[in-house]
């Protein structure tokens, strides 16, 4: 069960160049305690990749990761925070 101040989020990461992959992986390894799931798909027709992450953490932690990803050259990141329908009692 989630603690009160923790959220679940999904981040979509569009990686436009192979040179950007190392920076993305290095950054994600620093936030590995937040990652619940990861899936990567190559888009060869665009010479790019799409990574989706399922995360659990505080709003500050999740926002910091998303912001840092978006500052990497050749990387676009979008975050979606999920709302719990049944909050803990």
Provide a role label for each language-model segment.
Residues 1-89:
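Long, contiguous binding/interaction regions
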């Amino acid at each position: 069960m989630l603690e009160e101040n923790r959220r679940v989020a999904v981040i979509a990461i569009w990686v436009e160049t192979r040179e950007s992959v190392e920076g993305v992986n290095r950054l994600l390894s620093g936030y590995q305690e937040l990652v619940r799931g990861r899936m990567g798909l190559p888009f060869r027709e665009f010479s790019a990749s799409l990574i989706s992450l399922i995360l659990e953490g505080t709003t500050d932690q999740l926002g910091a990761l998303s912001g840092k990803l978006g500052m990497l050259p050749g990387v676009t990141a979008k975050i979606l925070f999920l709302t719990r329908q049944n909050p803990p009692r």
